[in-house]
Amino acid sequence: MIACGAARYALARGDRAEAAELWPLVEWCLEYCRRQLTADGVVASDTDELEGRFPTGDANLCTSTLYYDALLSAVSLGRELGVESAQTARYAAQARALARAIDAHFGGEVGGYDTYRYYAGNTLLRSWICMPLIVGLKERSEGTVRALLGPELMTDDGLLTQQGSSTFWDRSTLYALRGIFRAGYADKAGDFLHRFT
């Protein structure tokens, strides 16, 4: 999460000196995540944004998609900073491999939708299935958008954290909206937005 946030912050801020100061942190975090890759090529992690309030398995969709986005952001930031092209090419190759691993490990049918399992063995829809959409992974966008907007997750208050629960979180609702827009479903995202304004 730090690599993703720091790289995106540096790119948005546009301050070369500050970006150069943050670059070693980004590199360190990317290397840490790389060393946490499982045999399936996704990031091993026993926690996520919800800090243990819901099950996450040994590797979760949110952590791996944030690492994917961090790799892509580091490619852009590295190019801006004049980092050796071999390093940015390595990050780009790692991102491509991770995209394939995310689909292979997390992709599947959940609740009748062609979408993502939040972790291996998960059988309930989770609001954070929006994460691949946010980072530009579109292989399962149609099913994921349908799942996010379906009755299993959608409530008058926003998206449920997990199908069948009563917990919702504004952050995942806003992330889902962003992901639906990014996946190219502006009409559905617009309808979604109007429900909450």
Feature roles, as predicted:
Residues 101-106:
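Short amphipathic coiled-coil heptad-repeat segments
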Residues 2, 31-39, 139:
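Glycine-rich, acidic and aromatic/proline-enriched surface loops and short helix-turn segments
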Residues 20, 24-31, 52, 56-89, ...:
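Active-site core of glycosidic bond-cleaving carbohydrate-active enzymes
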Residues 7, 23, 27, 36:
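Substrate-binding cleft and catalytic face of glycoside hydrolase catalytic domains
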Residues 1-4, 69:
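Residue register of alpha-helical TPR repeats
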Residues 9-12:
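Hydrophobic or amphipathic alpha-helical targeting/insertion segments
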Residues 42, 47-52:
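A short, charged helix-loop
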